């Protein structure tokens, strides 16, 4: 009881305060005392419930999670209160309603209980998310306990832009960027990344935004991340731009942007050095994990809200004002939320109203938003029921225009009967020229709104009478739920040409595409060019045919084509822009088709033989463009302009093309080898990656890569061995090494080896020159040496140059050798008895015989004595005429 008494004291205090507030309320609103008392009772009941809730056992109920909204390109984050759904020991499962997994753009973190993601343009619409709790059963299966379903509606990229800017921040003191005025452009900084958002998981997208948030210190809700559309990486309206660290774009590209201010220019833009320098030097790329292609700053025009069309609650009787409604008021779109016993979402039925952008007003008001000069006037007779006119059906008394543009005829607004709820029928009713007075049609129950028909061309020959009801009826009062003057009475104005397309350049065999800029035309009612209907025509108001080499997609407003050699020259086309009212503006421009960009100088020619008949490919421009796109995709190039189609011939389908990314000079052999290995093996068999890129439209049979231009002597992938009768072809170079090793070998081959050879030649030449010089100088004396030996004479030997170690020989010692042998005996003469020799010539001996036998008693011949003194008449040098001593006599050992 003490606890109860302690709890009742604050209860009585609260009761006293409530009674005091009731008294004050009664003093101010004495006419409604019952409401104040009833409000007091409710507050008292709530107070009692809050005091005694701790002592009551809570009944497990399903807690509803509020619905959420997301915007394309913006981060979405919501915390799921799992503690209110699941108790201890239960497992939380989050998935799409009726499915096993979440949508592809959402990520669930079971630890932090946060559901986050970043939707793309393909994720627009309403997504129903189911949060269920399950308990592990005895058999190991999960037994569902409770479940809750909520919805997330994804709006387009330009929807509700200021709300994302004015998002509440976690820090109360944080300065939230102010929204710009309605007509004021928003200055946006955009960073281009070499990434593909479609290949990322939701977690990777959010992590990319978080890394950019930590790098740039920009709040997460202020950043936008969208993929690149139509290869438009850079904005042509940017007034500031800079490069990144990426040299080549590989992926599709992603644009990460945030707001800088309102209508800034180059002088008033804030300091961007924190983006410019890191993007160029690679610091931003290292932080984000993706290469940065560049950045730019541009002013974006705000997107004007589209005028909405609503059903008109009117009666067939013309009155000055619309009275109270007699039909049931349509309820806003409803959604079926499953209970814990049936967690599945029921399929949509015929009782569900069509989705609308804004809630349907509760009061019976009429909102009329028309485009063009359309005046709501009552008709003279009963209104005909809605009729769907088939193609080729002629309605009597009706003006039939010569040209009907589909997609711009307004739907007929109908009145919903009081007891039924139907979907809005999407039918169009032509306006009758003369009101019908047939009595059989006087019981009309579904009056129709005045339809919008295209303006008739003056060439119409129908002359049916037309009744103009402009002043015969009283003016109709129109109520609108929004402020502003209705535009129903304003005349439709013709679109204006703001910026000419002027000229488009194209090359033979190269695919091109041109996105019509949004500022080309402008219409006061329909605004920019992307809201208008564009049509490409020839000079004679003739539409471009399906087989023309130039095609135009009116939905994406993209002009593309693939010219061949017969289209070289200048071609004139006309772009017609038509608004919703049928008025149009025209811009004339020229397409200049040039010859092939590389001509016959391409370093390599790629040739592929495909299965099938070449005639359908040659005659169908769409198939040719598809083939070029597939070839570019097989090489890893997203830009199709890198492929130049040379020829398509017979022999199945023989396609010959060149790659515009290869340099012309010098021969890029390594790059060609790399491209060849990517699509085929050494024998010319297509690789699986190349075949998969062409399938299912084309099937590759064989591939050949032949050098041309600077590489004309090389053949990289042979198609077939040369025939015996043909001349000897150059040897095929089969690359059997890695490209890096081949590059190093080329460096040695073209740089190191020639340098060594030249150095060796110079060294040998130097050695030969030095030898020749030394040989020529040998035997020649210098001037000093020549001066020394210029006089002839006996050399002078000084006294100190003599060897005096041995004493001179004594005079008593004979001058002959001590071991000298005795002299030979004297010769024998012919007078001796036995001659020692026999004359060689007997005739000669016979001549001298009488001389020997003349005097036998004569003495033997005695030789004369030797000379002891010089002969007279010959002078000799006097003694001691030289200043040096004679050398010592020879002394035998």
Swiss-Prot record:
User: What InterPro entries does the annotation carry?
Assistant: Alpha-dystroglycan_domain_2 (IPR027468), Alpha_DG1_N2 (IPR041631), Cadg (IPR006644), Cadherin-like_sf (IPR015919), DAG1_C (IPR008465), Ig-like_fold (IPR013783), SEA_DG_dom (IPR030398)
Instruction: Give the residue ranges for region: Disordered.
Output: 379-498, 722-744, 821-893
Q: Coiled-coil annotation: which residues?
A: none
Q: Where is the composition biased (Basic and acidic residues)?
A: 734-744
What is one GO biological process annotated to this record?
cellular response to mechanical stimulus
Q: Which residues are glycosylated?
A: 139, 315, 317, 377, 639, 647, 659
The chain's Cytoplasmic topological domains, given as residue ranges, are 773-893
- Where is the region O-glycosylated at seven sites with GalNAc? 461-483
Modified residue Phosphotyrosine is at which positions? 890
> Can you list the disulfide-bonded cysteine pairs?
180-262, 667-711
Q: Note down the stretches annotated as region Required for laminin recognition.
A: 28-406
Cite the position(s) of the site with description Cleavage.
Answer: 651-652, 713-714
Q: Which domain of life is it from?
A: Eukaryota
- Stretches for region O-glycosylated at one site: 47-69
Query: How does a null allele present?
Result: Homozygous null mice embryos exhibit gross developmental abnormalities, beginning around 6.5 days of gestation, in the Reichert's membrane, an extraembryonic basement membrane. In peripheral nerves, ablation of DAG1 from 4 week-old mice causes abnormalities in nerve structure and function including mildly impaired sorting of axons, dysmyelination, axonal loss and aberrant nerve conduction. Laminin-binding is lost and there is disruption of the Schwann cell dystroglycan complex.
Record protein name field: Dystroglycan 1
Q: Which organism is it from?
A: Mus musculus
The gene is: Dag1
């Amino acid at each position: 009881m003490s606890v109860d008494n302690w709890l009742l004291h604050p209860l009585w205090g609260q009761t006293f305060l409530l009674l005091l507030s009731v008294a004050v309320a009664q003093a101010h609103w004495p006419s409604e005392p019952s409401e104040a008392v009833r409000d007091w009772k409710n507050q008292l009941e709530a107070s009692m419930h809050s005091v005694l809730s701790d002592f009551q056992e809570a009944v497990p109920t399903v807690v509803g999670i509020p619905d959420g909204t997301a915007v394309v390109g913006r981060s979405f984050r919501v915390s799921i209160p799992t503690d209110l759904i699941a108790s201890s020991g239960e497992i939380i499962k989050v998935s799409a309603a009726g499915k096993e997994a979440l949508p592809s753009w959402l990520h669930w973190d079971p630890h932090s209980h946060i559901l986050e993601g970043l939707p793309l343009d393909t994720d627009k619409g309403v997504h129903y998310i189911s949060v269920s709790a399950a308990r592990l059963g005895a058999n190991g299966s999960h037994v569902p306990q409770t479940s809750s379903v909520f919805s997330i509606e994804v709006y387009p990229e330009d929807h509700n832009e200021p709300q994302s800017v004015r998002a509440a921040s976690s820090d109360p003191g944080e300065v939230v960027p102010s929204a710009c005025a309605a007509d004021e452009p928003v200055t946006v900084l955009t960073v281009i990344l070499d990434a593909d958002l479609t290949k990322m998981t939701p977690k990777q997208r959010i992590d990319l935004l978080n890394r950019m948030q930590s790098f740039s210190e920009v709040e997460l809700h202020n950043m936008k991340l969208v993929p690149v559309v139509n290869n438009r990486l850079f904005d042509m309206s940017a007034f500031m731009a800079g490069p990144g660290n990426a040299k080549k774009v590989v992926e599709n590209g992603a644009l990460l942007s945030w707001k800088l201010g309102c209508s800034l220019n180059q002088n008033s833009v804030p300091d961007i050095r924190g983006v410019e320098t890191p993007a160029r030097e690679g610091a931003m790329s290292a932080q984000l994990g993706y290469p940065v292609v560049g950045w730019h700053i541009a002013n974006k025009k705000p997107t004007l809200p589209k005028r909405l069309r609503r059903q008109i609650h009117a009666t067939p009787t013309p009155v000055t004002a619309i009275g109270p409604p007699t039909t049931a008021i349509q309820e806003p779109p409803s959604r079926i939320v499953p209970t814990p016993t049936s967690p599945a979402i029921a399929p949509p039925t015929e009782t569900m109203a069509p989705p609308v952008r804004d809630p349907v007003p509760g009061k019976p008001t009429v909102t009329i938003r028309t485009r063009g000069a359309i005046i709501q006037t009552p008709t003279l007779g009963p209104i005909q029921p809605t009729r769907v006119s088939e193609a080729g059906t002629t309605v009597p008394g009706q003006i039939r225009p010569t040209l009907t543009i589909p997609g711009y005829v307004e739907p007929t607004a109908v009145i919903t009967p009081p007891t039924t709820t139907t979907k809005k029928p999407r039918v169009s009713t032509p306006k009758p020229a003369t009101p019908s007075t047939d009595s059989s049609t006087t019981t009309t129950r579904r009056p129709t709104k005045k339809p919008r028909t295209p303006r008739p061309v003056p060439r119409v020959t129908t002359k049916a009478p037309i009744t103009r009801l402009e002043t015969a009826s009283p003016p109709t009062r129109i109520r609108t739920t929004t402020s502003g003057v209705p535009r129903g009475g304003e005349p439709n104005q013709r679109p204006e040409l703001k910026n000419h397309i002027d000229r488009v350049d194209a090359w033979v065999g190269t695919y091109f595409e041109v996105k019509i800029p949004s500022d080309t035309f402008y219409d006061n009612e329909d605004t920019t060019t992307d809201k208008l209907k564009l049509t490409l025509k020839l000079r004679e108001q003739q539409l471009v045919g399906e087989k023309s080499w130039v095609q135009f997609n009116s939905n994406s407003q993209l002009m593309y084509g693939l010219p061949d050699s017969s289209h070289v020259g200048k071609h004139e086309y006309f772009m017609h822009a038509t608004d919703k009212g049928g008025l149009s503006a025209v811009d004339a421009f020229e397409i200049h088709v040039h010859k092939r960009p590389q001509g016959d100088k391409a370093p390599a020619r790629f040739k592929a033989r495909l299965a099938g008949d070449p005639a359908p490919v040659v005659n169908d421009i769409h198939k040719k463009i598809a083939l070029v796109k597939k070839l570019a995709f097989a090489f890893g190039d997203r830009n199709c302009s890198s492929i130049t189609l040379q020829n398509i011939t017979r022999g199945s389908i023989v396609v010959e093309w060149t790659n515009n990314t290869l340099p012309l000079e010098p021969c890029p052999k390594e790059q060609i080898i790399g491209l060849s290995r990517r699509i085929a093996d050494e024998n010319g068999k297509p690789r699986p990656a190349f075949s998969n890129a062409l399938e299912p439209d084309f099937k590759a049979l064989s591939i050949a890569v032949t050098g041309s231009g600077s590489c004309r002597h090389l053949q990289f992938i042979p198609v077939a061995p040369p025939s015996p009768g043909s001349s000897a072809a150059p040897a095929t170079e089969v690359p059997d090494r890695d490209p890096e090793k081949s590059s190093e070998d080329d460096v040695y081959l073209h740089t190191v080896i020639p340098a060594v050879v030249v150095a060796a030649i110079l060294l040998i030449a130097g050695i030969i020159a030095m030898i020749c010089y030394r040989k020529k100088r040998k035997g020649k004396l210098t001037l000093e040496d020549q001066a020394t030996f210029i006089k002839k004479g006996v050399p002078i030997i000084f006294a100190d140059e003599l060897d005096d170690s041995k004493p001179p020989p004594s005079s008593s010692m004979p001058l002959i050798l001590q071991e000298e042998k005795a002299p030979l005996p004297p010769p024998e003469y012919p007078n001796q008895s036995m001659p020692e020799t026999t004359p060689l010539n007997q005739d000669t001996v016979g001549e001298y015989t009488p001389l020997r036998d003349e005097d036998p008693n004569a003495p033997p011949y005695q030789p004369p004595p030797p000379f002891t003194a010089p002969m007279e008449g010959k002078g000799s040098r006097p003694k001691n005429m030289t200043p040096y001593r004679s050398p010592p006599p020879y002394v035998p050992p």
